[in-house]
């Protein structure tokens, strides 16, 4: 099967959608499918190689422009120039299916949706779109949504947003991970990483929605019980100093996973606009206990048949966060380790990938039905 993946965001800055597209592309290639990715900006050879892709499998849609979207700075492009590049990519690709990611915002995904004449699968990632994007979607998507032959959402919340603003009824298929990339670390003493308890925060701490200020406000109460508490922050942001907190900056995946593996708590204090808790899964895959804000997207990935695999607290409430961290630290370190690893395994690409490919088949069938033509066979499936 020839699959065209359309990513709306530049790969110059890491993000959940970009990582998902790369992971999916790499998995599809492993299964013998032909893959091509188009996105704004450039993708480095080393970044592509992390998922088994090569530069010839990436096409640039032109220069990326930073805009504020969903509480973050997204690097996208849109307009005549990108449209011409997308049209050329579609014509040369001769794809069996075109897979758009985040089609609710004005990006190259909408251009591809308008320009393609092939079966279309669309994945909705956004749980809380910006007002401007909603207005745009209300004007444009109703006229174009019929071009989507199969719809996916990464979470139940993202599915609700997609249905409300575009009328589609997506199938929920979460983001994928390569479980083997996350070595499971078991506790060998009271604390997972050494002589002191360790709490790890991961993300762009300058963005208010990441909840770093909630964490710092919660720490004094935790330190009252654990004065030797160690706190590390992994992620980008302006240089700053917070007493008792180490800022490690951006780390490669191997280093980041090593820190997660030795963490006594992975803390996720985000205040909103999270559609999927991918980092919670990554932390659990490494064996780290999770303490998270009770966002709907986080509860979805933290829940198994027995209940919550971790501790949660009220969104934005530092006192509640303190109590949740204290409860977690009082427990045996590996109390929920096996359950967490099992939850993460549910999102391995060996599980997620076939679900996505099944939606490609649905797209082909719906494409044929809606256009009144003989069903287009998806080669290689």
Swiss-Prot record:
Recorded metabolic or biological pathway in which this protein acts: Phospholipid metabolism; phosphatidylinositol metabolism
Pfam families noted in UniProt: Glyco_trans_1_4, Glyco_transf_4
Main localization category: membrane
Gene3D superfamilies to which the protein is assigned, alphabetical: Glycogen Phosphorylase B (3.40.50.2000)
Catalytic activity entry: a 1,2-diacyl-sn-glycero-3-phospho-(1D-myo-inositol) + GDP-alpha-D-mannose = a 1,2-diacyl-sn-glycero-3-phospho-[alpha-D-mannopyranosyl-(1<->6)-D-myo-inositol] + GDP + H(+)
Cofactor requirement: Mg(2+)
A GO term, aspect molecular function: phosphatidylinositol alpha-mannosyltransferase activity
UniProt superkingdom: Bacteria
SUPFAM superfamilies noted in UniProt: UDP-Glycosyltransferase/glycogen phosphorylase
Site entry (Important for catalytic activity), positions: 125
The protein's Enzyme Commission number: 2.4.1.345
Keyword Lipid biosynthesis on entry: yes
A single Gene Ontology CC term: plasma membrane
InterPro entries, A to Z: Glyco_trans_4-like_N, Glycosyltransferase_grp1
Residues at which a 1,2-diacyl-sn-glycero-3-phospho-(1D-myo-inositol) binds: 18, 69-70, 75
Residues involved in GDP-alpha-D-mannose binding: 9, 16, 204, 209-210, 251-253, 256, 274-278, 282
Any one biological process term the GO annotation gives: phospholipid biosynthetic process
Compartment list: Cell membrane
Quaternary structure, from the entry: Monomer.
Functional note: Involved in the biosynthesis of phosphatidyl-myo-inositol mannosides (PIM) which are early precursors in the biosynthesis of lipomannans (LM) and lipoarabinomannans (LAM). Catalyzes the addition of a mannosyl residue from GDP-D-mannose (GDP-Man) to the position 2 of the carrier lipid phosphatidyl-myo-inositol (PI) to generate a phosphatidyl-myo-inositol bearing an alpha-1,2-linked mannose residue (PIM1).
Family affiliation: Belongs to the glycosyltransferase group 1 family. Glycosyltransferase 4 subfamily.
This protein's name: Phosphatidyl-myo-inositol mannosyltransferase
Organism of provenance: Propionibacterium freudenreichii subsp. shermanii (strain ATCC 9614 / DSM 4902 / CIP 103027 / NCIMB 8099 / CIRM-BIA1)
């Amino acid at each position: 099967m020839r699959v065209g993946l359309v990513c709306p965001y530049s790969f110059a800055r890491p993000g959940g959608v970009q990582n998902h597209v790369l992971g999916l592309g790499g998995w599809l290639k492993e299964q013998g499918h032909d893959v091509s990715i188009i996105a704004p900006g450039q993708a480095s050879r080393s970044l592509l190689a992390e998922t088994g892709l090569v530069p010839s499998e990436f096409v640039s849609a032109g220069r990326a422009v930073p805009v504020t979207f969903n509480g973050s700075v997204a690097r996208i492009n849109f307009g005549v120039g990108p449209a011409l590049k997308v049209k050329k990519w579609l014509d040369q690709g001769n794809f069996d299916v075109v897979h758009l990611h985040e089609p609710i915002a004005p990006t190259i995904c909408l251009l591809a949706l308008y320009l393609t004449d092939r079966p279309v699968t669309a994945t909705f990632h956004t749980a809380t779109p910006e007002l401007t994007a909603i207005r745009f979607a209300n004007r444009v998507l109703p006229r174009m949504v019929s071009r989507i032959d199969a719809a996916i959402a990464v979470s139940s919340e993202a599915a609700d947003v997609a249905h409300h603003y575009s009328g589609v009824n997506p199938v929920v298929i979460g983001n994928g991970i390569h479980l083997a990339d996350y070595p499971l670390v078991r506790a060998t003493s009271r604390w997972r990483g050494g002589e002191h308890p360790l709490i790890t925060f991961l993300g762009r701490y300058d963005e208010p929605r990441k909840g770093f200020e909630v964490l710092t406000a919660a720490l004094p109460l935790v330190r009252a019980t654990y004065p030797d508490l160690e706190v590390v922050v992994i992620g980008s942001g302006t240089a700053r100093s917070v007493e008792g907190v180490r800022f490690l900056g951006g780390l490669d995946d191997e280093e980041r996973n090593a820190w997660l593996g030795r963490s006594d708590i992975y803390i996720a204090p985000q205040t909103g606009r999270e559609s999927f808790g991918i980092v919670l899964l990554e932390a659990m895959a490494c064996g780290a206990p999770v303490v998270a804000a009770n966002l709907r997207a986080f509860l979805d990935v933290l829940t198994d048949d027995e209940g919550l695999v971790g501790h949660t607290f009220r969104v934005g409430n530092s006192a509640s966060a303190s109590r949740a961290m204290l409860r977690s630290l009082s427990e045996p370190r590996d109390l929920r380790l096996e359950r967490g690893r099992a939850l993460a395994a549910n999102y391995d690409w060996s599980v997620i990938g076939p679900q996505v490919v099944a939606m490609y088949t649905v797209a082909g069938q719906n494409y044929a039905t809606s256009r009144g033509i003989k069903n287009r066979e998806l080669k290689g499936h």
